[in-house]
Amino acid sequence: SRKDFPILSREIQGNILTYLDNAASSQKPMEVLEGIKQFESNDYSNVHRGLHTLSVLSTSAYEESRKIVQKFLNAKSSDEIIFTSGGTDSVNLVASSYADENLSQGDEIIITTMEHHANIVPWHFLRERKGIQIKWIDCDQNGKFDINQFEKAITSKTKFIAVTQMSNVLGASPNIKNIIDLSHSQGIPVLIDGCQGVVHEKIDVQELDRAFYLFSGHKLYGPNGIGILY
Protein backbone atom coordinates (compact mmCIF):
# COMPACT_ATOMS: atom_id res chain seq x y z
CA SER A 1 0.00 0.00 0.00
CA ARG A 2 1.03 3.67 -0.25
CA LYS A 3 1.96 3.79 3.42
CA ASP A 4 4.75 1.27 2.78
CA PHE A 5 6.53 3.79 0.53
CA PRO A 6 7.80 6.86 2.44
CA ILE A 7 8.37 8.89 -0.72
CA LEU A 8 4.66 8.72 -1.58
CA SER A 9 3.83 10.86 1.45
CA ARG A 10 5.71 13.88 0.16
CA GLU A 11 4.15 16.82 -1.65
CA ILE A 12 5.25 18.13 -5.04
CA GLN A 13 3.83 21.43 -6.30
CA GLY A 14 1.18 21.31 -3.59
CA ASN A 15 -0.03 17.80 -4.34
CA ILE A 16 0.66 14.44 -2.72
CA LEU A 17 2.97 12.50 -5.01
CA THR A 18 1.46 9.98 -7.40
CA TYR A 19 4.31 8.05 -9.01
CA LEU A 20 3.63 6.44 -12.40
CA ASP A 21 7.13 5.76 -13.71
CA ASN A 22 7.61 2.25 -12.34
CA ALA A 23 8.47 0.89 -15.79
CA ALA A 24 11.63 2.99 -15.59
CA SER A 25 12.41 2.45 -11.90
CA SER A 26 10.34 1.65 -8.84
CA GLN A 27 10.34 3.40 -5.48
CA LYS A 28 11.58 1.55 -2.40
CA PRO A 29 9.29 0.39 0.41
CA MET A 30 10.29 1.02 4.01
CA GLU A 31 11.26 -2.64 4.47
CA VAL A 32 13.94 -2.31 1.78
CA LEU A 33 15.17 1.06 3.05
CA GLU A 34 15.44 -0.27 6.60
CA GLY A 35 17.19 -3.41 5.39
CA ILE A 36 19.81 -1.35 3.57
CA LYS A 37 20.29 0.91 6.59
CA GLN A 38 20.59 -2.06 8.95
CA PHE A 39 23.23 -3.76 6.81
CA GLU A 40 25.26 -0.63 6.10
CA SER A 41 25.10 0.50 9.74
CA ASN A 42 25.84 -2.80 11.46
CA ASP A 43 27.14 -5.60 9.24
CA TYR A 44 28.89 -4.08 6.23
CA SER A 45 32.27 -5.41 5.19
CA ASN A 46 34.01 -6.90 2.16
CA VAL A 47 32.44 -10.14 0.93
CA HIS A 48 34.60 -13.26 0.56
CA ARG A 49 37.65 -11.20 1.51
CA GLY A 50 38.14 -11.71 5.24
CA LEU A 51 37.86 -13.99 8.26
CA HIS A 52 36.82 -11.34 10.76
CA THR A 53 33.28 -11.17 12.12
CA LEU A 54 31.88 -8.45 9.85
CA SER A 55 33.26 -10.09 6.71
CA VAL A 56 31.77 -13.43 7.74
CA LEU A 57 28.39 -11.78 8.41
CA SER A 58 28.45 -9.91 5.10
CA THR A 59 29.45 -13.01 3.17
CA SER A 60 26.71 -15.03 4.84
CA ALA A 61 24.08 -12.41 3.96
CA TYR A 62 25.41 -12.20 0.41
CA GLU A 63 25.18 -15.95 -0.18
CA GLU A 64 21.84 -16.22 1.59
CA SER A 65 20.41 -13.66 -0.81
CA ARG A 66 21.66 -15.80 -3.69
CA LYS A 67 19.66 -18.72 -2.26
CA ILE A 68 16.59 -16.50 -1.99
CA VAL A 69 16.91 -15.64 -5.69
CA GLN A 70 17.40 -19.33 -6.48
CA LYS A 71 14.12 -20.12 -4.74
CA PHE A 72 12.37 -17.15 -6.36
CA LEU A 73 13.33 -18.42 -9.84
CA ASN A 74 13.14 -22.13 -8.95
CA ALA A 75 16.71 -22.66 -10.12
CA LYS A 76 18.27 -26.04 -9.37
CA SER A 77 21.29 -24.53 -7.63
CA SER A 78 22.35 -21.20 -6.17
CA ASP A 79 25.52 -21.62 -8.26
CA GLU A 80 23.36 -20.79 -11.29
CA ILE A 81 22.65 -17.30 -9.91
CA ILE A 82 25.12 -14.60 -10.95
CA PHE A 83 25.04 -11.16 -9.35
CA THR A 84 25.60 -8.23 -11.72
CA SER A 85 25.21 -4.47 -11.47
CA GLY A 86 21.89 -4.54 -13.33
CA GLY A 87 20.04 -5.66 -16.44
CA THR A 88 22.40 -3.89 -18.83
CA ASP A 89 25.43 -5.47 -17.21
CA SER A 90 23.78 -8.89 -17.46
CA VAL A 91 23.21 -8.57 -21.21
CA ASN A 92 26.74 -7.28 -21.70
CA LEU A 93 28.12 -10.21 -19.71
CA VAL A 94 26.38 -12.75 -21.95
CA ALA A 95 27.34 -10.86 -25.11
CA SER A 96 31.00 -10.51 -24.14
CA SER A 97 31.39 -14.08 -22.84
CA TYR A 98 29.12 -16.75 -24.30
CA ALA A 99 28.21 -14.95 -27.54
CA ASP A 100 31.70 -13.58 -28.13
CA GLU A 101 33.16 -17.05 -27.70
CA ASN A 102 30.61 -19.01 -29.71
CA LEU A 103 29.54 -16.74 -32.58
CA SER A 104 31.56 -16.10 -35.74
CA GLN A 105 31.44 -13.81 -38.76
CA GLY A 106 28.23 -14.28 -40.73
CA ASP A 107 26.30 -15.83 -37.85
CA GLU A 108 22.91 -14.29 -37.08
CA ILE A 109 21.30 -13.00 -33.90
CA ILE A 110 17.55 -12.39 -33.76
CA ILE A 111 16.16 -9.58 -31.60
CA THR A 112 12.87 -7.67 -31.67
CA THR A 113 11.81 -4.07 -32.12
CA MET A 114 10.26 -4.26 -28.63
CA GLU A 115 13.62 -4.46 -26.89
CA HIS A 116 15.04 -2.00 -24.36
CA HIS A 117 18.30 -0.43 -25.55
CA ALA A 118 20.09 -2.58 -22.98
CA ASN A 119 19.15 -5.60 -25.11
CA ILE A 120 20.12 -3.92 -28.37
CA VAL A 121 23.39 -2.03 -27.96
CA PRO A 122 25.51 -5.00 -26.74
CA TRP A 123 24.59 -6.93 -29.90
CA HIS A 124 25.58 -3.98 -32.09
CA PHE A 125 28.97 -3.96 -30.37
CA LEU A 126 29.23 -7.71 -30.95
CA ARG A 127 28.45 -7.14 -34.62
CA GLU A 128 31.31 -4.65 -34.84
CA ARG A 129 33.71 -7.05 -33.11
CA LYS A 130 32.73 -10.30 -34.79
CA GLY A 131 30.99 -9.42 -38.04
CA ILE A 132 27.71 -11.07 -37.09
CA GLN A 133 24.35 -10.11 -38.56
CA ILE A 134 21.34 -8.82 -36.59
CA LYS A 135 17.83 -9.75 -37.67
CA TRP A 136 14.87 -7.75 -36.36
CA ILE A 137 11.40 -9.10 -35.61
CA ASP A 138 8.71 -6.40 -35.86
CA CYS A 139 5.50 -6.20 -33.88
CA ASP A 140 2.27 -7.09 -35.65
CA GLN A 141 -0.46 -4.50 -36.28
CA ASN A 142 -1.64 -4.90 -32.68
CA GLY A 143 1.80 -4.20 -31.22
CA LYS A 144 2.36 -7.84 -30.28
CA PHE A 145 5.20 -10.24 -30.98
CA ASP A 146 4.83 -11.83 -34.43
CA ILE A 147 5.59 -15.51 -33.87
CA ASN A 148 5.11 -16.33 -37.57
CA GLN A 149 7.67 -13.74 -38.63
CA PHE A 150 9.99 -15.06 -35.93
CA GLU A 151 9.72 -18.65 -37.12
CA LYS A 152 10.42 -17.62 -40.72
CA ALA A 153 13.46 -15.57 -39.64
CA ILE A 154 15.30 -18.58 -38.20
CA THR A 155 17.87 -20.05 -40.58
CA SER A 156 20.86 -22.35 -40.37
CA LYS A 157 22.93 -19.23 -39.63
CA THR A 158 20.86 -18.26 -36.57
CA LYS A 159 23.08 -18.81 -33.53
CA PHE A 160 21.48 -16.71 -30.77
CA ILE A 161 18.13 -15.14 -29.88
CA ALA A 162 17.53 -12.28 -27.43
CA VAL A 163 13.99 -11.21 -26.59
CA THR A 164 12.14 -9.31 -23.89
CA GLN A 165 9.68 -11.02 -21.59
CA MET A 166 7.60 -7.83 -21.53
CA SER A 167 8.07 -4.62 -23.48
CA ASN A 168 8.81 -1.59 -21.30
CA VAL A 169 7.11 0.60 -23.92
CA LEU A 170 4.05 -1.38 -25.03
CA GLY A 171 3.60 -3.82 -22.17
CA ALA A 172 3.29 -6.61 -24.75
CA SER A 173 4.38 -10.05 -23.52
CA PRO A 174 5.69 -12.54 -26.08
CA ASN A 175 5.07 -16.20 -25.30
CA ILE A 176 8.61 -16.89 -24.17
CA LYS A 177 7.95 -20.60 -23.66
CA ASN A 178 7.01 -20.96 -27.34
CA ILE A 179 10.04 -18.92 -28.38
CA ILE A 180 12.38 -21.03 -26.26
CA ASP A 181 10.88 -24.35 -27.36
CA LEU A 182 11.10 -23.39 -31.03
CA SER A 183 14.66 -22.09 -30.66
CA HIS A 184 15.98 -24.96 -28.57
CA SER A 185 14.47 -27.51 -30.96
CA GLN A 186 17.00 -26.17 -33.46
CA GLY A 187 19.84 -25.91 -30.98
CA ILE A 188 19.72 -22.12 -30.67
CA PRO A 189 20.37 -20.55 -27.24
CA VAL A 190 18.01 -17.85 -25.97
CA LEU A 191 18.35 -14.85 -23.66
CA ILE A 192 15.22 -13.51 -21.97
CA ASP A 193 15.25 -9.93 -20.65
CA GLY A 194 12.94 -10.21 -17.65
CA CYS A 195 13.42 -6.73 -16.18
CA GLN A 196 9.77 -5.80 -16.80
CA GLY A 197 8.18 -9.24 -16.82
CA VAL A 198 9.56 -10.56 -13.55
CA VAL A 199 7.48 -7.98 -11.68
CA HIS A 200 4.22 -9.27 -13.15
CA GLU A 201 4.70 -12.94 -14.03
CA LYS A 202 5.88 -15.94 -12.03
CA ILE A 203 9.06 -17.41 -13.50
CA ASP A 204 10.28 -21.00 -13.28
CA VAL A 205 13.68 -21.09 -14.97
CA GLN A 206 13.65 -24.89 -15.06
CA GLU A 207 10.64 -24.65 -17.36
CA LEU A 208 12.63 -22.25 -19.55
CA ASP A 209 14.98 -25.14 -20.38
CA ARG A 210 18.37 -23.55 -19.70
CA ALA A 211 17.69 -20.18 -21.33
CA PHE A 212 19.62 -17.17 -20.03
CA TYR A 213 17.30 -15.08 -17.84
CA LEU A 214 18.02 -11.68 -16.30
CA PHE A 215 16.41 -8.91 -14.30
CA SER A 216 17.36 -5.91 -12.17
CA GLY A 217 16.61 -4.97 -8.57
CA HIS A 218 15.54 -1.36 -9.04
CA LYS A 219 12.44 -2.28 -11.06
CA LEU A 220 11.45 -4.84 -8.43
CA TYR A 221 11.30 -2.40 -5.47
CA GLY A 222 14.88 -3.28 -4.59
CA PRO A 223 18.14 -1.32 -4.38
CA ASN A 224 19.89 0.29 -7.32
CA GLY A 225 23.02 -1.30 -8.70
CA ILE A 226 22.03 -4.95 -8.38
CA GLY A 227 21.02 -7.36 -11.12
CA ILE A 228 20.57 -11.09 -11.61
CA LEU A 229 21.72 -13.32 -14.44
CA TYR A 230 20.61 -16.93 -14.49
Which sequence ranges carry the predicted segments?
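Pyridoxal 5′-phosphate
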Residues: 1-230
